[in-house]
Amino acid sequence: PLELSSAASDVYKRQLVYPTGLIGTGIFVYILFNFSLLGDMIINGYFFIMSIYGWYYWSRKKDDVFINNVSRLENKEYTQLILLALGSLIFIYFVYVQFDKWNSWTAYVDNITTAIFFVAMWLMARRKIESWIFWIIGDLITVPLYFYKGLTISSLQYIIFTVLAILGYISWKKILLKTNHQ
């Protein structure tokens, strides 16, 4: 429930996403560790840190007006995005090897989704509309992974996350269109 309220807050650009996200990620880290999904466990630790950063970033004001609005990626940010994705792929690979868990196709898939979610959260904290595309892709890959690992309820939760991410993209697209016409 906390993760769902956090995702719904993202859709509507509300800062409630951050406190609910902090609690939800802490609980989910424990669950993911027990199911040997180390990449997803680490990504939730990253979500925790990025939630603190995003809370600060989203709440910044100048003269009682929020200064960080929804925007698109700029060309210079694509390099950062690629480096973040590659860095997370390499880091999570080494975590799996260190714990001797790089032994199943699920480790490969978990590594890929972790990289996708690292990028999605970074973009979300920066209020970039492209974050929703990464959330949608990552969620769609995670649904069958969690179902296969026996995390049926979490799999269903990611179906809901996918719907919320689609709604988030639509909502933020409307905001962008509105701000570009003013």
Where are these regions (language model features)?
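Alpha-helical transmembrane segments in multipass membrane proteins, preferentially the mid-helix core
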Residues: 91-99, 111-128
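Membrane-water interface of transmembrane alpha-helices
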Residues: 46-63
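Hydrophobic, membrane-inserted alpha-helices
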Residues: 4-6, 23-29, 115-120, 137-144
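Single conserved hydrophobic/aromatic residue that forms the stacking wall/gate
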Residues: 1-8, 12
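C-terminal transmembrane-bundle signature of multipass membrane proteins
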Residues: 131-136, 141-180
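Hydrophobic core of alpha-helical transmembrane segments in multi-pass integral membrane proteins
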Residues: 5, 78-96, 162-165
